[in-house]
Design a protein with these regions (language model features):
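Alpha-helical membrane-embedded segments
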Residues: 109-113, 183-193, 227, 237-261
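Alpha-helical transmembrane segments of multi-pass integral membrane proteins
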Residues: 80-89, 106-116, 133-157, 183-185, ...
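Membrane-helix interface and helix-disruption motif detector
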Residues: 11-13, 29-49, 62-72, 88-108, ...
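Short, highly charged, low-complexity non-transmembrane loops/tails of multi-pass membrane proteins
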Residues: 212, 262-283
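Cytoplasm-facing juxtamembrane segments at the starts of transmembrane helices
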Residues: 3-22, 68-78, 120-149, 203-222, ...
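Generic alpha-helical transmembrane segments
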Residues: 46-56, 106-116, 177-199
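Juxtamembrane/interface segments at transmembrane-helix termini
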Residues: 121-125, 157, 194-205, 238-241, ...
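Hydrophobic, membrane-facing alpha-helical anchors
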Residues: 1-6, 47-65
């Protein structure tokens, strides 16, 4: 049996956030396909923006799910989102330009199955469990695909598994180790996303919870993760493409961080300018 914690209700309805997050994520992923038409990686930053949009949606989904009193389930929700999402993302990359849509469908099916097992087999009996795990699986899959685009410039299987090394500055040879999957970057993306999606609600929950503050923190965590991914992208895309992604990530992070601090000041009972602990001699 579960009890819903009504104190955290309010703000923008979850359905609106879900629709906006899904549409924004899919649009950004497809805008990154401009890399193919221009034969560059300059539009890889759209993958990072897709990550931020998906994380905002996922963070609010975790809030809805964990409103039923499963506090320790917040980190677990982030992990199951990406654990199920990575399966859908990897399978979907074999479908070329249709990969984002295929990832969405596959992840939804996986999440639906996990939600059913959680409620009916594990007997958790949480009313929103099936819908929430379905959403989180989709969020995990699309977030990982966004990181893949940001780091490699592509969301196709070939782009994620094949890199190249240059010998003597002249001869370029394919190398599967220098790639998103072969180089283990998918594991880093997994952790960046799973932490970013579950941390904001954990940090903002309580009687003073406000939706706008939590979602602003989510965006800040998203851009912070984008900075890390943009730095990693220098190994796989051109320097110009990496710099573009890094600059956009830095601008987004500075803006969202300052906004989050302002919202924290707004909601705090008091904001004290504490001083360093004095170093008293003889103690």
């Amino acid at each position: 049996m579960s009890v819903k914690v009504e104190v955290i209700e309010g703000g923008v309805p979850h359905q609106k956030i879900m629709i906006a997050g899904l549409v924004a994520t899919i649009v950004c992923l497809y805008l990154s396909y401009l890399n193919v038409y221009t034969n560059t990686a300059y539009f890889s930053f759209f993958g990072g923006l897709a990550v931020v949009a998906a994380l905002i949606w996922g963070s609010n989904t975790i809030k809805v799910l964990c409103s039923y009193g499963i506090g320790t389930g917040v980190p677990s929700a982030g992990m199951i989102a990406f654990g199920s999402g990575v399966i859908a993302m990897l399978l979907a990359t074999k479908f070329g330009i249709a990969a984002p849509i295929v990832a969405l469908v596959l992840a939804a099916v996986i999440g639906l199955i996990l939600g059913y097992l959680s409620n009916e087999v594990l007997n958790m009996k949480i009313p929103v469990m099936i819908q929430s795990l379905t959403e989180l699986a989709v969020v995990g899959a699309l977030t990982l695909m966004g990181f893949a685009v940001l780091i490699t410039g592509s969301f196709t299987f070939t782009g994620l598994t094949t890199g190249s090394v240059t010998l003597f500055g002249m001869i370029s040879m394919p190398s599967y180790q220098v790639s998103f999957i072969g180089g283990g970057l998918v594991a880093v993306a997994f952790l960046l996303g799973s932490i970013a999606v579950q941390h904001p609600f954990n940090a903002c929950l309580g009687p003073g919870w406000k939706q706008d503050r939590m979602l602003m923190l989510t965006a800040e965590c998203g851009f912070l993760s984008m900075i890390v991914a943009a730095v990693m992208s220098f190994a796989l895309v051109s320097m110009i493409a990496g710099i573009i992604s890094l600059l956009i990530a830095l601008i987004g992070w500075v803006y969202t961080y300052t906004q989050y601090i302002e919202l924290s000041k707004r909601d705090a009972a008091a904001w004290l300018d504490s001083k360093p602990i004095p170093d008293v001699e003889g103690h």
